Each structure stands twice: as structure tokens, then as C-alpha cells.
């Protein structure tokens, strides 16, 4: 039973005894006492005045006095206007801690029976994953874990954007300047090689535009008439027509990229339950476009292009099929949404996509609604801010992007340098050290990104993220390692601290604070899931680690002479370490046994 429910239940008894009135505990308002007042939890008295026929102060004091006299778990009370602030006794906190320890599934919320699909990553197969993709992947993965922890059945999915004119640009550049290069012949990872071709296409395009302008053409026209751009569109038409030569090159280069993606995902600890490919889904969208034309929802212009007019809804006309018959990005989004809701009987669908696509998802939901799909209301766009570096925004076509692979390697090196400086790993094997460096580096990267509210644009600083002090992943990892070290020392001394039976002891103020914080874990999971914000869990883990370190600084745990108190303290910190593991596990971050 939660503290809130306990108070509501006992307050209901008090009201019956004092005013001979029946009131359901669920009808009473109980919340954590605000910091400026003295108390643990507060009961709102105002709604009870109709029963007491008295003032808020008299009513609050009467209920408080009854609770103090009849409920041993309540030690003190004070009434401020219409708010009854209650303090729990030592007995209550012992009992609550016992319940937490006994609950092997502590933190897991009841099963909802809901199916939720989370789409994230969704990269283009014309470049490697970069820092922006990392935020997307880490958000998508942690939100999926968070929704699962809150009782939902979660399907993690990605849509690989493996077709379109942007893919053809890399293919065309490879034909023009690639000289037959392969990952094997160059030693370059496949996704990086294809990314180099995308940058090369942009160089070719810029040169052609400059030449056209020099020949007297205006800039706007030149950008549309550049020969290589026309060739890329022609290649896309050939691809959609099934041209064997184009399809073979496409399959070959896509294979290079997908293999590279798999290596990057593995390094990040990212997996998917279902992978969709745009090349296999874009035709689904075309079927819906035909349906929309038949329904009169879409219109076909004289040039053959198909549009949805959303001006009456405060938006623009939206292109669905180009005049040359090729589809645009939203076309396949319509088709895949329909397929997913039918295939997985979804209750909701979360798209993790950057905030530059806010308009796109407004349009997507509106068009699906116009097509008669009521489930469109259950689509949620988890819009997040961009990741920036001191140099500013990243642009793939200019080759100024920070690659995910390079960043992961940099984090590994930062973790190694910081760990080696401490000199605490001298007796660890090189293999174990390498695993630890990867765990710390990845934990630093993930935590630094996830702790920021998804809606906010953020600046990533690798060196700051690896700091063993402050609000960082390594600080929490180090805290966990410190707890495990204390428990190992206890075992070496032959101290047993099995949680059952748990002795009831006089708890210190800091121990009560830790128990309070532990108790809020399920509520934090619910709060984070409702807001689609793993930052809630990240900051909870930091608060817990910070509170433990203060406790450890002030409390000589292993020097305690009272056996019951010593046992309680060891069980307390063991429980803390378990909750830290669970919280950080939601973020996809591992915690080491030693650092």
C-alpha cells in the first residue's frame, strides 16, 4: 500500500469516527507535503467541511488528533489553513522499507494489455549514423524500455529509408567518381563509403550549378536544371520501373550500408523487433492514394500529380504523387501506418522524429483521419530538439557531420583515460578493462543525452559527459560500484544481511530520506512514461546516487556495532543498488561491479 493510500484509508476511518460519515479513501486528496511545510504527506481538508460543519483549522486538527491517537504509524501533525500535514513514525518507515524489499518486482507497474509500437532511428541508406541519429536511437530505445516498464507490450521498430532520390545521389556519384571502390578494396566501413559518395554528389552538384550560373542562368533555375540532379531523378524512375542495372547497384550499395548500420547498432546496444524497408512499403502508400482519389479526399492536377488540400484545416496543399508518378516520403508513411495498426492491433504508435518534422506529422495524422482511420488519434509524434556541437548544426551533404562510430570510439578513449588516471584497475585483466571502458564510455554518452528533456535542443560535450562527479552516467556507475564494494567487504568479513527477516530499527533522517526516494520509483516510471520522457528516470537515478553518497559520507556503514542496524543498512544499500540498476537499465545503461 502506498503512503498516500495508507493515509487516505486511515483518514476515512477518522471521518467515520468523528462525523459518522462514510467517504471512500479514493475521494480524499493526499499528496507529498510541500517543501516549505513540515510533514511527509498532506491531506486536503476543504472538501470535508460539509461533513464537519466547522472551520478548516478545527477540522484538520480534529482529524490529526484522532490519527495521532489511533494510528501508531503517524507520529505528529500540524494544520496550516485547510491543509493537514502528517508525519510518519519510525514504525511506518520500517514497514514501508520492508514492503519495498519484499517486492521482487518493485518498480514494475501493472500490465495494461496495450500494444504500443515505437518507431525510431529510421536512417537513410546514403550515409552513416551521426550524432543526431544517436539522440534519436537513445530516446527511442529508452522510451520503449520505459513504456514496457510501465506495463505495456512494446514493439520496437525502424523504417529504413532505402529508396528515393537521396539514395540515387550516392549511387550516381559512385558511378561517376567511385572508381569501383568497395568496403573490401578500400578498408572503409560500408556506410561511411556510401556517405562519402553522397558528399561527392553534392560537390558535383555545386560545380554544375556554378557553371550554369556562369553561363547566364539565374540561381533558382540552375539549382533545378543541374544535369546530375536530373540524372538522379531519372535513376529513381528507373528504380521504380524495376530496371535491373539500377536495382543491382542499389542492392549492392544498400548491403554495404546496412552491414555498417548493424555494427553501429550493436556498439550502441540497440535492437529492433521489426524492421521495415521503404522499398517494400512505398507501394502500400500508392494504394491508399488511389483509395483517397476514389473517396474524393485527394485531387489529381492536370500534370498528373496527386495532392491533398488541407487549406481548410489551416495547413497547405500536400503533394502525394509527383507528376512523373513517383511517390514522396509521406506516401509510404500513410501505407506503413495502416499496415502496422492492422498487423499488430496497436493501441498507439509513437514516432521518435526530430522537431523539424512537426509539420509532417500534423499532416500525416490529418490525412489518415480524412481517409477514415479513427486510430489516427492514437499516433503520437515524440518531437525532440537537435543535438548541437560548439561548431553548430551538422550537415551530412557537406561532410561536416560527427559520425556515431567516431563518437563511440572517442567516448571509449575518454573513459580509458579517466579510468587509468584513477589507478584503481591495476589488477584487472586487459579484456575486463576494455569491457569496463566501453561500459563507462557508452554510459556517459547515453546518460548525457537522455537526461535532457527531449523537447530541448542540446549541446553535447564528450569531456563533460565522462566526469565522475556531477550529473553524469559515470557518477551513477561509480556510485553503484562503490555500493557493491561495500557489500563485498561485508561478505569478506562474514557479515550476513539477508533481507528476511528484516529487523525494525531506529532509522536516521538520512535513511528515511533514502526510503522515501526509493518509494517514489514506481511513480517516476509512471510519470516518465506518461510524458514519454526518460529524462525523468535519468534525473531520478542521479538524485538517488547523490542521496546515497551523502549518506555514505556521514554514516560509517561497516563500523556499526549494533547487528540489527548494520543488517538494515546493508539491506538498504543493496536495495539502492538494485533500484539504480533497474532505473539505468530503462535507459539502456549497464552498471559495473567495480570501477
Regions found by a protein language model. Give the residues of each.
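Non-catalytic interaction-recognition regions
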Residues: 1-94, 110-595
Amino acid at each position: 500500500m502506498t503512503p498516500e493510500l495508507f493515509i487516505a484509508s486511515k483518514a476515512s476511518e477518522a471521518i467515520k469516527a468523528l462525523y459518522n460519515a462514510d467517504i471512500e479513501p479514493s475521494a480524499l486528496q493526499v499528496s507529498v507535503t510541500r517543501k516549505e511545510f513540515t510533514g511527509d504527506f498532506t491531506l486536503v481538508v476543504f472538501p470535508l467541511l460539509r461533513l464537519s460543519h466547522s472551520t478548516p483549522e478545527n477540522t484538520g486538527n480534529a482529524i490529526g488528533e484522532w490519527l495521532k491517537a489511533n494510528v501508531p504509524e503517524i507520529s505528529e501533525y500540524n494544520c496550516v489553513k485547510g491543509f493537514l500535514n502528517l508525519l510518519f513514525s519510525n514504525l511506518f518507515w520500517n514497514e514501508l522499507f520492508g514492503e519495498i524489499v519484499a517486492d521482487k518486482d518493485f518498480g514494475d507497474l501493472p500490465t495494461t494489455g496495450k500494444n504500443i509500437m515505437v518507431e525510431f532511428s529510421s536512417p537513410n541508406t546514403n550515409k552513416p549514423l551521426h550524432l543526431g541519429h544517436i539522440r534519436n536511437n537513445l530516446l527511442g530505445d529508452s522510451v520503449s524500455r520505459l513504456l514496457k516498464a510501465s506495463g505495456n507490450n512494446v514493439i520496437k521498430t525502424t523504417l529504413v529509408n532505402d529508396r528515393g532520390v537521396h539514395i540515387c545521389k550516392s549511387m550516381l556519384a559512385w558511378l561517376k567518381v567511385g572508381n569501383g571502390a568497395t568496403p573490401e578494396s578500400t578498408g572503409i566501413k560500408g556506410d561511411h563509403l556510401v556517405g562519402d559518395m553522397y558528399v561527392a554528389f553534392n560537390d558535383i552538384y555545386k560545380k554544375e550549378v556554378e557553371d550554369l550560373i556562369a553561363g547566364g542562368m539565374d540561381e533558382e533555375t540552375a539549382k533545378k536544371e543541374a544535369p546530375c540532379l536530373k540524372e538522379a531523378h531519372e535513376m529513381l524512375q528507373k528504380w521504380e520501373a524495376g530496371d535491373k542495372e539500377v536495382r543491382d547497384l542499389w542492392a549492392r550499395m544498400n548491403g554495404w550500408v546496412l552491414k555498417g548500420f548493424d555494427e553501429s547498432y550493436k556498439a550502441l546496444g540497440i535492437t529492433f523487433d521489426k524492421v521495415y524497408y521503404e522499398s517494400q512499403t512505398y507501394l502500400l502508400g500508392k494504394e491508399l492514394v488511389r483509395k483517397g482519389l476514389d473517396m474524393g479526399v485527394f485531387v489529381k492536377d492536370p500534370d498528373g500529380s496527386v495532392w491533398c488540400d488541407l487549406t481548410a484545416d489551416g495547413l497547405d496543399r500536400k503533394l502525394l504523387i509527383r507528376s512523373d508518378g513517383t511517390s514522396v516520403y509521406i506516401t509510404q508513411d500513410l501505407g506503413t501506418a495502416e499496415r502496422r495498426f492492422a498487423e499488430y492491433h496497436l493501441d498507439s504508435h509513437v514516432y521518435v522524429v526530430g522537431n523539424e518534422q512537426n509539420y509532417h506529422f500534423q499532416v500525416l495524422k490529418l490525412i489518415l483521419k480524412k481517409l477514415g482511420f479513427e486510430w489516427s488519434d492514437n499516433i503520437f509524434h515524440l518531437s525532440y530538439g537537435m543535438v548541437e556541437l560548439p561548431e553548430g548544426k551538422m550537415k551530412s551533404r557537406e561532410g561536416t557531420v560527427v559520425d556515431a562510430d567516431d563518437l563511440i570510439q572517442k567516448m571509449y578513449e575518454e573513459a580509458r583515460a579517466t579510468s587509468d588516471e584513477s589507478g584503481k584497475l591495476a589488477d584487472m585483466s586487459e579484456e575486463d578493462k576494455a569491457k569496463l571502458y566501453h561500459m563507462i564510455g557508452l554510459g556517459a554518452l547515453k546518460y548525457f543525452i537522455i537526461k535532457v528533456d527531449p523537447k530541448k535542443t542540446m549541446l553535447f560535450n564528450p569531456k563533460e559527459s565522462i566526469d565522475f562527479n556531477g550529473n553524469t552516467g559515470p557518477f551513477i556507475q561509480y556510485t553503484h560500484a562503490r555500493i557493491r564494494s561495500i557489500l563485498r567487504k561485508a561478505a569478506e568479513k562474514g557479515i550476513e544481511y539477508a533481507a528476511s527477516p528484516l529487523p525494525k530499527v531506529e532509522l536516521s533522517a538520512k535513511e528515511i530520506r533514502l526510503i522515501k526516494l526509493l518509494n517514489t520509483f514506481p511513480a517516476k516510471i509512471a510519470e516518465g512514461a506518461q510524458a514519454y520522457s526518460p529524462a525523468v528516470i535519468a534525473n531520478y537515478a542521479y538524485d538517488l546516487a547523490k542521496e546515497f553518497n551523502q549518506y555514505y559520507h556521514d554514516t560509517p556503514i561497516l563500523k556499526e556495532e549494533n547487528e540489527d542496524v548494520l543488517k538494515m543498512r546493508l539491506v538498504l544499500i543493496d536495495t539502492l543498488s538494485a533500484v539504480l540498476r533497474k532505473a539505468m537499465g530503462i535507459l539502456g545503461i549497464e552498471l559495473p561491479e567495480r570501477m
